Amino acid sequence: MQRLLILVAVCLLSGCLTAPPKEAAKPTLMPRAQSYKDLTHLPMPTGKIFVSVYNIQDETGQFKPYPASNFSTAVPQSATAMLVTALKDSRWFIPLERQGLQNLLNERKIIRAAQENGTVAINNRIPLQSLTAANIMVEGSIIGYESNVKSGGVGARYFGIGADTQYQLDQIAVNLRVVNVSTGEILSSVNTSKTILSYEVQAGVFRFIDYQRLLEGEIGYTSNEPVMLCLMSAIETGVIFLINDGIDRGLWDLQNKAERQNDILVKYRHMSVPPES
């Protein structure tokens, strides 16, 4: 009977073992949240708006906890690129290059110098036009990152055999605002946040099955929601709110007025600030 128990335990533990992957995963497009699907399925505007985005700063001052490097920030520093992508993918705006403006100006100087010297390439013989000016600017920042906002778990153990699970919620918050280039007036502003879920599931056995015979085994699984995807989702949600607010306040309009009751617009229009937990 004891040999049978040992055999069963060994089979169970061997079945729980997972071999490391033989090769790294192939490159793929970045996974996106529901907010991206909503953003790309908004109704069309009467006309696209020229917009400039300079720099979305990280104002949290948070760094990754030990044992990560003390110089690694807790949130990605690529919020500007994420916002430009969200504005373009919404099909409501035409983003103008401003983050790398100096590089663009340098390249234009090189072309003009070549045109003056008569050594310009065929594809650059046409005189350069003036850069397009934006109607509005979208400013903003990452205004908060709180770790361990909520945590918990559950587990049970009986005669040395048991399992448990634990979870932790972090939170990241973003501010976005639309600024009128002509007057400097802030036309619209919104704060959005996204929770970041991390959880762990583990099971194990620690039991003497006979005198001087110890059965010990464990298995576990950990999943951490990528902070980058959560930040991107918060920015995409903020862009949808800005578009919705601009429609309601007459800053811009829909191509088809009947689409004011579009399911996506209605969903975000009726979203309310959740109560403090």
UniProtKB/Swiss-Prot annotation:
Membrane topology designation: Lipid-anchor
Query: Which keywords, in A-to-Z order, does the entry hold?
Result: Cell membrane, Lipoprotein, Membrane, Palmitate, Signal
Q: Where is the signal peptide?
A: 1-15
- GO cellular-component terms in the record? outer membrane-bounded periplasmic space; plasma membrane
Q: Name one Pfam family in it.
A: CsgG
Instruction: Report the superkingdom from the record.
Output: Bacteria
Keyword flag Calcium: no
Lipid moiety (N-palmitoyl cysteine) attached at C16
Which compartments is it annotated to reside in? Answer: Cell membrane
Q: Where is the lipid attached (S-diacylglycerol cysteine)?
A: C16
Entry coiled-coil feature ranges? none
The UniProt entry's sequence similarity note says: Belongs to the CsgG family.
Which PANTHER family does the protein's record reference? CURLI PRODUCTION ASSEMBLY/TRANSPORT COMPONENT CSGG, CURLI PRODUCTION ASSEMBLY_TRANSPORT COMPONENT CSGG
Function per UniProt = May be involved in the biogenesis of curli organelles.
This protein's name:
Curli production assembly/transport component CsgG
Q: Which source organism? A: Citrobacter koseri (strain ATCC BAA-895 / CDC 4225-83 / SGSC4696)
